[in-house]
Amino acid sequence: SIKGIGNYQDWDLVCDNTGTCRMAGYQDESSDPVSILFTRAAGENATVEGKLTILPFGEADRDVQVGQDIEIWLNGKSLGKVKHISDDAPDKLTEEQTKALLSGLKKESEIRLTYGKTTLKVSDKGAAAAMLKMDEFQQRLNTPSALIRQGQEKHAVLAPKVKPKIDAVSVNNRKTIELKHGEKQFNH
């Protein structure tokens, strides 16, 4: 597999050519349509951004409503609420919620989301492995900015790269030629 792409039980990791890594965790073999996404750009001081997505069940009493509060629980302790802003975009977690979840996911943890009468679970299986791989890809292992294997090493971490710019090339004297079946050029 490509160095920056991996699947770790219920978590996926994708790192792109700018050095940004995204890891997403899903429900554990149940049909709960929920995921948490953590995104971190390259660079020593880059923070981790957390987002929450709950897809519709198609059942009015179980679907999260726009404007409804979703409470996040880690090992039975409330991390506070997130307001569901839109069905078309993920809901942003606070910095405190993100840090608490990342810390909890380093070991076995239970993550639950509650709203109305509905409780959804996000799996912890594979999260620590995905975080370790993210640290490795971004060259953070044993540095203070590592998520998993923190240390005091001062080596440079992966610097953010600019997205490659693609220039469209103009073609001069364009002529359109229709090739018909049976013509010599058609068979090339």
Where are these regions (language model features)?
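A generic "folded-domain core" signal
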Residues: S1-H188
